[in-house]
Amino acid sequence: SYEGQFNVVVCQNDNEAYGAMDAMDAAGITYGVDGDVTLISFDATHDGLQYTLDGKINCDVECNPIQAEVVAGVIQKMEAGEDYDKTTLVEDSAFVAPGIESEYATTMTDEILAGRAY
C-alpha cells in the first residue's frame, strides 16, 4: 500500500509524469486535484498542460524551449565579435490546475492552452 508512504510525485518531465500516471492508475492510486497524491511535472508541453487543465497534474513548470534560440543568438554575437549581454534570462512559467491557488503560478485555462506557441 502507498498510504503513508508517499503523497507527492515529482517528475522531471511530462513523459515521466505520464508514466507515473499509468503506474498509479494500474495500482488504483488516485492523483491530481481530487486525488490522494499530488503530481508535479516539468516541461509544460501541450499534453502536459492539458492534463493540468483536466486536474490530473497539479502543477506543470515550464522548461522554455525558446531558450535555444536565445542561446544561439548570443553565440552568433560572440562569434561575430559583437557586444552581448553577459547575463541573459529566459522566462519560464509555472501552471497549476483549476482550483489550486498560487501566487507563484498561473491557473491553466482553455484560453492559455490555446494561445501557447508550443
Language model feature labels by segment:
Residues 5, 30, 57-58, 84:
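A general structural signal for well-ordered secondary-structure junctions
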Residues 63-118:
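Hinge/cleft segment of the Venus flytrap/periplasmic-binding protein
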